[in-house]
Amino acid sequence: LTGCKSPSKIAAEKAGEKILEKAAGVKVDIDGEKMTVVGEDGTQMTMGGNEWPEDQMAKEIPKMGSGTVSYVLNSAEFCTIIINEVKEKDFEKYLTEVESAGFSAEKAEYSDDANSIYIAQNDKRISLQLNYEHKSEALSLAIVKESE
């Protein structure tokens, strides 16, 4: 039962959902650190959480096998993930996986003592940007579906 939420936590989440739904005119589902917003047109965006998302735009990129996910923003059009505790060798391995997954068109790379940046696109017109901060061992990943 240690994984169950307390009644007060459930009540607080439900109250927060109602306030946000009324203010924004959207459906809101709060589940601990994760919030899902569904617009009137059915579009969905998920924010928060500390797990790698496996749906919407996140399904278009390889899953990072190391580090600790600290932030997620995921929708059908874009995805941002921040991963901490990523060693440089793990970033380099992930970069190889991303390129092998097809993110190699329109490629631009930059690296200095502070950052390594990789920008590319795949054949589905999905653009990806990786920014690895060497000192903090943090990887910021962003993908967006380009409009046609």
Question: Where are the regions a protein language model picked out?
Answer:
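A short, sequence-level motif marking secondary-structure junctions
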Residues: G48-E54, E99, N131-S136
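C-terminal motif of bacterial Sec signal peptides marking the signal peptidase cleavage site
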Residues: T2-G3
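Second-shell loop/turn segments in exported
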Residues: F78-V86, I126
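Short amphipathic beta-strand and strand-loop transition segments with alternating hydrophobic
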Residues: G67-V72, K107, Q129-Y132
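Compositionally biased P/S/T/G-rich terminal and signal peptide-adjacent segments
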Residues: P7-C79, E146-E148
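Amphipathic alpha-helical segments
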Residues: E85-E106
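Short, exposed beta-strand-loop hairpins at the edges of beta-sheets
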Residues: I117-K145
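Surface-exposed aromatic
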Residues: A76-I81, D112-Y118
